[in-house]
Swiss-Prot record:
PROSITE patterns: BETA_LACTAMASE_A (PS00146)
Enzyme class (EC, first level): hydrolase
GO molecular function, one term: beta-lactamase activity
Protein name: Beta-lactamase CTX-M-4
Hydrolase among keywords: yes
Family stated for the protein in its record: Belongs to the class-A beta-lactamase family.
Organism: Salmonella typhimurium
Extra information: The class A beta-lactamase family has a specific amino-acid numbering system, sometimes called Ambler or ABL numbering and often misspelt as Amber. A multiple sequence alignment was used to derive a consensus sequence and then the consensus was numbered taking into account insertions and deletions. This allows use of identical numbers, e.g. for active site residues, despite differences in protein length. UniProt always uses natural numbering of residues, hence there appear to be differences in numbering between this entry and some papers.
Length: 291
C-alpha cells in the first residue's frame, strides 16, 4: 500500500484489494473519483479539500488534502476533546460549573443565551459547542483550557503537527485566503478525528462521550449526512465562515462495513459568498460510493 500527497492535479486511492482486482481496475476507480471531484470543484468556483480514511484497511481518498483551510467551527471538536482528556484524571471535571454572563455572549449562542446570569457545566458546554455550534460555549471551553494555544498544544500531544488555533469565536472564522491562523489540512484533521473517536487518544468513557456528542449534532443534515444513505450512522461537526467557507468533519458507520472518517473543507474567493453545504454533500456521495 502506498501513500501520496494529493494536489489539485492528482488524487490517489490507496487500498489493499483482493487479487481479483487488477491494477487497471484500481486506476480506473481512482480516475473516476478524481474526475468527479475535479468537476465538482470547478463547477463550484471555490477550493475543495477532501480526506477520507477507510478504517477497514486504512486506505485513503485524498483531494487537495495537504493544503490549509480555515477550520471554523470544526475546531470545536479539538477543544471539547481536550476537556474530555482532562476529565480522565478528574472524574468530577465535567460537572464543574461555569458562569455565563451577558457580556460573554457573541454572535451565535443558542444554548448559552438561555443560561445568562446562571451557570453551565463543562459537559453542557461541550454538548452545546458540538451539537449546536454554540460560540459562547466554545469560548468557555477555550478559557477553561487556558487559551487557544492550549488547544493547539493538545493537538500536538496527539501527534498532530498541523492543527493551529490562534483566536476565539467569532474571529477565528475570518477564513482570509492565505491566512494560516486557525487552519489545518483535511488529511491532518481526518487522522486526528480518527484517533479521537476510534483510536486510543481518549480513554474509552471519554471517547464514547465524544462520539455521542457528534452523533447528536443538529447542524449537519444538509452537509455530509445529506450524501449518505439514511441507514448509515453519522457523527459530525460542521463549520462556516467568511469567504463562503463551508466545512464538515465526520465519522461514518456504513451498514456492514468498518467506519469511515471523512473531512470536507470548502472555501470561495469572495468574502461575502454564501455557504455551499450542497458541495460537501456531493463530495461525500462521490467518495463513499461503493461502500
Amino acid at each position: 500500500m502506498m501513500t501520496q500527497s494529493i494536489r489539485r492535479s492528482m488524487l490517489t486511492v490507496m487500498a489493499t484489494l483482493p487479487l481479483l482486482f487488477s491494477s487497471a481496475t484500481l486506476h480506473a476507480q481512482a480516475n473516476s473519483v478524481q474526475q468527479q471531484l475535479e468537476a465538482l470543484e470547478k463547477s463550484s468556483g471555490g477550493r475543495l479539500g477532501v480526506a477520507q480514511i477507510n478504517t477497514a484497511d486504512n486506505s485513503q481518498i485524498l483531494y487537495v488534502a495537504d493544503e490549509r483551510f480555515a477550520m471554523c467551527s470544526t475546531s470545536k471538536v479539538m477543544a471539547a476533546a481536550a476537556v474530555l482528556k482532562q476529565s480522565e484524571s478528574d472524574k468530577h471535571l465535567l460537572n464543574q460549573r461555569v458562569e455565563i454572563r451577558a457580556s460573554d455572549l457573541v454572535n451565535y449562542n443558542p444554548i448559552a443565551e438561555k443560561h445568562v446570569n446562571g451557570t453551565m457545566t463543562l459537559a453542557e458546554l461541550g454538548a452545546g459547542a458540538l451539537q449546536y455550534s454554540d460560540n459562547t460555549a466554545m469560548n468557555k471551553l477555550i478559557a477553561h483550557l487556558g487559551g487557544p494555544d492550549k488547544v493547539t498544544a493538545f493537538a500536538r500531544s496527539l501527534g498532530d503537527e498541523t492543527f493551529r488555533l490562534d483566536r476565539t469565536e467569532p474571529t477565528l472564522n475570518s477564513a482570509i485566503p492565505g491566512d494560516p491562523r486557525d487552519t489545518t489540512t483535511p488529511l491532518a484533521m481526518a487522522q486526528t478525528l480518527k484517533n479521537l473517536t476510534l483510536g486510543k487518544a481518549l480513554a474509552e468513557t471519554q471517547r464514547a462521550q465524544l462520539v455521542t456528542w457528534l452523533k447528536g449534532n443538529t447542524t449537519g443534515s444538509a452537509s455530509i449526512r445529506a450524501g449518505m444513505p439514511k441507514s448509515w450512522g453519522v457523527g459530525d461537526k460542521t463549520g462556516s465562515g467568511d469567504y463562503g467557507t463551508t466545512n464538515d468533519i465526520a465519522v461514518i458507520w456504513p451498514e456492514n462495513h468498518a467506519p469511515l472518517v471523512l473531512v470536507t473543507y470548502f472555501t470561495q474567493p469572495e468574502q461575502k459568498a454564501e455557504s455551499r453545504r450542497d458541495i460537501l454533500a456531493a463530495a461525500a456521495k462521490i467518495v463513499t460510493h461503493g461502500f
